[in-house]
């Protein structure tokens, strides 16, 4: 079994959540010490409500480094621009554009098609 790409491991931690949209809390998640290792609030982050399989499938047969669009829509939560680390939260369902490297998602590019 090939070793998982380090960037994919980071991508999963940063962008994929098994929590439902209803249960998800931007302030709780974004202020978690794992998310703010240097104590700085991250200005914006989008979370994909999914298990890892369908997200990884976007990068199937993607050799090299390339941006790919999902063929299915995902429920998404975006945590926005904190004022004193208090986040606003917006939910949507949409396609996603991610950067794939050798069959692994490594970067969230944007909501919507590439």
UniProtKB/Swiss-Prot annotation:
SUPFAM superfamilies: RNase A-like (SSF54076)
Recorded GO CC terms: extracellular region
Catalytic activity, EC: 3.1.27.-
Disulphide-bonded residues: 26-79, 41-85, 59-100, 97-114
Positions bound to substrate: 42-46
PANTHER family xref list: RIBONUCLEASE, RNASE 3
Quaternary structure (record): Monomer.
UniProt family annotation: Belongs to the pancreatic ribonuclease family.
The protein's name in its UniProt record: Amphinase-4
Classification lineage: Eukaryota, Metazoa, Chordata, Craniata, Vertebrata
């Amino acid at each position: 079994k090939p070793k998982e790409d380090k960037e994919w491991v980071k991508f999963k931690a940063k962008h994929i959540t098994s929590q439902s949209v209803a249960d998800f809390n931007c302030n709780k998640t974004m202020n978690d010490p794992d998310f703010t290792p240097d104590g700085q609030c991250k200005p914006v982050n989008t979370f994909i409500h999914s298990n890892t399989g369908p997200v990884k499938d976007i990068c199937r047969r993607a050799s090299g480094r390339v941006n790919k669009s999902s063929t299915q829509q995902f429920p998404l939560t975006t945590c926005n621009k904190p004022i004193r680390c208090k986040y606003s939260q917006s939910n949507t369902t949409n396609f996603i554009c991610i950067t794939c490297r050798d069959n692994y998602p490594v970067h969230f590019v944007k909501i919507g098609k590439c």
